[in-house]
Amino acid sequence: GDVVKKKLHLPMAGGEGDIYILYIDGLCNNEFVSETIIKPLTWEWHDNVSPDLMNLIWEYGAQTADITKEDNFDNAVWAAMKGDTAVFVSGSSEALVVSTKKLPLRGIDESSVESGMRGARDSFNEGFRTSTALIRRRIRDTGLKVEQGVIGRRSRTDYALMYIEDLAEKELLDDIRERISAYEIDAIYDSAMAEHLMEKKWYNPFPVFQSTTRPDKAAAAIADGRVAIVCDNSPEVLLVPATMNTLFQTADDYYNRWPVAVFARIIRYAAAFIAIFLPGIYIALTCFEREMLPDKLLYAIANARSNLSFPIVVEVLIMELLFELLREAGIRLPEKLGNTIGVVG
């Protein structure tokens, strides 16, 4: 399989010892493992070298790598599952973990979900450390804290809370930590799953978390005192708290002059109001408050509906359902076919 286990028998002064190397093929840099771990350990050691193999590897092996000691073998194995290399020595109660990650990741592309006219063009990808680095690159403040942890009993997914220590509210941080510690789940594959699990009221129609794929927007939110939740394997970062105002805010608002940004936000509020209440207003005016409509408009609506056998309420519900079907088809179907469905619809 992809689990690689190597055994090295090392003769030296004062006795002999075995070294076991564990790593995952495809998650680590195989060439780096060979050049910085295996090859140095196969050199001919001199008689004056200490017979303590653990210290021998610590001092002479993998000198160019980030190497740490681990007194818990389970943690060393979990590190190997993430792409590092675990080194075990016979007779030793410690293991060495060498940073050799080379995960299969896509590049940093422009966000296809949150496009904008101005600002940076990069976006998060599925790499955990890449996402935290994109935020750290924009906030070079010593007060920026990164609390890292693991969630999921089997997936062991990395996550991080990113915030500025003197800006984020302590009560908010305590609440987030409490919700995360209450997780009872085998695997977390995306930040969206973490979002659903952290919601206390599943029936609440309003989002408690705001998601973004743009590092500049996440950095601006952190600078405003909010908390960013970064999850491994997810191209989206969660921002808390999420208020109605923040949900109508885009990344362009940070770059445009305030009159332009305010006008654009007013347009968004108006569009949301129309989208939510227009069907109900249409039903109320055509069924119950006809006298509020001009006579010509009322006659036009009556003529248009003269050949329809559905009540107005059913007609509106069918229209809403068709919009949802077209939206779902545009998302799920292949890109070219989805665009065609949208045009025809």
Residue ranges and their predicted role:
Residues G1-I274, D295:
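Membrane-embedded alpha-helical signal segments
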Residues I229, A242-G345:
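Transmembrane alpha-helical segments that form the functional core of multipass membrane systems
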